[in-house]
UniProtKB/Swiss-Prot annotation:
InterPro entries: Ribosomal_uS2, Ribosomal_uS2_bac/mit/plastid, Ribosomal_uS2_CS, Ribosomal_uS2_flav_dom_sf. Keywords: Ribonucleoprotein, Ribosomal protein. It comes from Anoxybacillus flavithermus (strain DSM 21510 / WK1). It holds the Pfam family Ribosomal_S2. PANTHER family: 30S RIBOSOMAL PROTEIN S2 PROKARYOTIC AND ORGANELLAR, SMALL RIBOSOMAL SUBUNIT PROTEIN US2M. CDD domains: RPS2 (cd01425). This is Small ribosomal subunit protein uS2. SUPFAM superfamilies: Ribosomal protein S2 (SSF52313). One of its GO terms (molecular function) is structural constituent of ribosome. GO terms for biological process: translation.
């Protein structure tokens, strides 16, 4: 049985690509036809590609690998956070901070600062500090949490990236490529598939499409984790 059905993909509008004037010719092999100035993605290929990505993610997670979900466009923010949290992985759903991967040590310092302020809020330090100082710290905490909250437990570089719209997330993609970190991506008709190791040709602008595909990646991780639990129980 396939990981995802044609019916699910159709209902979520995964087949709608971008307007024909906004396309990347490298995506030609994933395009089925053109309708009313819009490219229609070949869903048979999407089914196959979801399967490949699913198996890769499942194997990686079974080996204890960590995946970083990246999606900062409005249509992706909620799904990225929800599905990464559901599968116990990391995420970036606000602005990608340049150097998140290539300058990881600096990012770790910011995370350390975030945890430091969190501790101050919890241990009563805020109660004894001047009000002005507390307001300032709370603002700093809010900002750090917004940008780094999804990676604050990420102690080392991830083993793979799952990216929604590699064109929008080109800095994240470039950093991962520089470090040879494999990339799984939801790639629309206006993107360059050559930069992505596991291409999922799909509509990256519809909330339902993004949610469906992101949830499949999370399912693969959870299936791997359940497999581990089953092995432990059997032992």
């Amino acid at each position: 049985m396939s990981v995802i059905s044609m019916k699910q993909l159709l209902e979520a509008g995964v087949h709608f690509g971008h307007q024909t004037r906004r396309w990347n010719p490298k995506m030609k092999k994933y395009i089925f036809t053109e309708r009313n100035g819009i490219y229609i993605i070949d869903l048979q290929k999407t089914v196959k590609k979801v399967e490949e990505a699913y198996n890769f993610v499942k194997e990686l997670a079974a080996d204890g690998g960590k995946i970083l979900f990246v999606g900062t466009k409005k249509q992706a923010q909620d799904s990225v956070k929800e599905e990464a949290e559901r599968s116990g992985m990391f995420y970036v759903n606000q602005r990608w901070l340049g150097g998140t991967l290539t300058n990881f040590a600096t990012i770790q310092k910011r995370i350390k600062r975030l945890k430091e302020i969190e501790r101050m809020a919890e241990d009563g330090t805020f109660d004894v500090l001047p009000k002005k100082e507390v307001v300032k710290l709370k603002k700093e905490l809010e900002r750090l949490e917004k940008f780094l909250g999804g990676i604050k437990e990420m102690k080392e570089l991830p083993d793979a990236l799952f990216v929604i719209d590699p064109r929008k997330e080109r800095i994240a993609v470039a950093e991962a490529r520089k470090l040879n970190i494999p990339i799984i991506g939801i790639v629309d008709t206006n993107c360059d598939p050559d930069e992505i190791d596991y291409v999922i040709p799909a509509n990256d602008d519809a909330i339902r499409a993004v949610k469906l595909l992101t949830s499949k990646i999370a399912d693969a991780i959870l299936e791997a984790k359940q497999g581990e639990e089953a092995v432990v129980t059997a032992e």
